[in-house]
């Protein structure tokens, strides 16, 4: 059962940097619904993409799986036999809860839940890879290498779903969408103190890119096609396609 996020409702003397620890994991479903506009839509539509792209006898990777929402959405929509989902996260608290969530929903497609660094995971025979608000937590210098590895591990006709918080090259647009996002959080019950303290903890950990930067990286990795398929304020999701026909 998810608890309401009140982690930052009182002043914290020494904030430090953001970590996905036990306290965050406990309130994560409430936190992300109230903080990320369009999150539920992205999760459900990842399932729709899985129905289109996942092929028999292949693997799906959910890199930075948190509590397994995307994994469950994918699994509900797989229409083929002999598929496997590999869900990876480096947070022990997230992984523990993810395993419980996955086990609570029975389905034919097996899920392997892995506690580990997504940079160290071998990607092979993949028809679909999901990076759902994960890449932004890697050092910028490490992002291209991960995308390169994903492209190489995808089968022809495979897809990468890349969801992120965006920055904007147009400062005026960036300011508007930043303010709209804060309005969204206020409307969901977060106080100015909560918004400010969480932002302070995230600012050195979550480093955002523009859509243009993401597309440039995807092209460099080898993806022949990529496009923004969902956006709400400064959050959104791209799909990148590897050319070829699935076997």
Curated annotation (Swiss-Prot):
Q: Which GO terms describe its molecular function?
A: carboxyl- or carbamoyltransferase activity; S-adenosyl-L-methionine binding
Q: What CDD domains does the database record attribute to this sequence?
A: AdoMet_MTases (cd02440)
Q: Please summarize what the entry says happens upon disruption of the gene.
A: Deletion mutant shows accumulation of 5-methoxyuridine (mo5U34) and 5-hydroxyuridine (ho5U34) in tRNA.
Per the UniProt entry, the Enzyme Commission number(s) are: 2.1.3.-
The positions annotated for binding S-adenosyl-L-methionine are 39, 64-66, 89-90, 117-118, 132, 199
Q: Which reaction does it catalyse?
A: prephenate + S-adenosyl-L-methionine = carboxy-S-adenosyl-L-methionine + 3-phenylpyruvate + H2O
In Pfam terms, one family for this protein is Methyltransf_25
Extract one GO BP annotation from the record.
tRNA wobble uridine modification
Transmembrane stretches in the record are none
The record's section on Gene3D superfamilies has: Vaccinia Virus protein VP39
The UniProt keywords, alphabetically, are: S-adenosyl-L-methionine, Transferase
Subunit details for this protein?
Homodimer.
Function of the protein: Catalyzes the conversion of S-adenosyl-L-methionine (SAM) to carboxy-S-adenosyl-L-methionine (Cx-SAM).
Q: PANTHER family attached here?
A: CARBOXY-S-ADENOSYL-L-METHIONINE SYNTHASE (PTHR43861:SF2), TRANS-ACONITATE 2-METHYLTRANSFERASE-RELATED (PTHR43861)
> HAMAP family under this entry?
Cx_SAM_synthase
Which family does the similarity line name? Belongs to the class I-like SAM-binding methyltransferase superfamily. Cx-SAM synthase family.
Q: Can you name this protein?
A: Carboxy-S-adenosyl-L-methionine synthase
Gene source species: Salmonella typhimurium (strain LT2 / SGSC1412 / ATCC 700720)
């Amino acid at each position: 059962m998810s608890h309401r996020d009140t982690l930052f409702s009182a002043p914290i003397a020494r904030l430090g940097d953001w970590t996905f620890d036990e306290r965050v994991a406990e309130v994560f479903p409430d936190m992300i619904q109230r903080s990320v506009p369009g999150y539920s839509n992205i999760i459900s539509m990842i399932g729709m993409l899985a129905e289109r792209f996942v092929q028999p006898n292949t693997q799906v990777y959910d890199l930075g799986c948190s509590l397994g929402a995307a994994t469950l959405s994918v699994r509900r929509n797989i229409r083929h036999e002999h598929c496997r989902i590999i869900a990876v996260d480096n947070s022990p608290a997230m992984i523990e809860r993810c395993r419980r969530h996955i086990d609570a929903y029975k389905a034919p497609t097996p899920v392997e839940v892995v506690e580990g660094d997504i940079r160290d995971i071998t990607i092979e025979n993949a028809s679909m890879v999901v990076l759902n608000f994960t890449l932004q937590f890697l050092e910028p210098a490490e992002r291209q290498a991960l995308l390169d590895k994903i492209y190489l591990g995808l089968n022809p006709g495979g897809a990468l779903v890349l969801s992120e918080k965006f920055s904007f090259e147009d400062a005026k647009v960036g300011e508007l969408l930043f303010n709209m996002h804060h309005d969204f959080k206020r409307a969901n019950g977060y106080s100015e103190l909560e918004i400010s303290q969480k932002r302070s903890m995230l600012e050195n950990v979550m480093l955002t890119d523009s859509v243009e930067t993401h597309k440039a990286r995807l092209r460099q990795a080898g993806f022949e096609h990529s496009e923004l398929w969902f956006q709400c304020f400064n959050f959104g999701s791209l799909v990148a396609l590897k050319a070829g026909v699935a076997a």
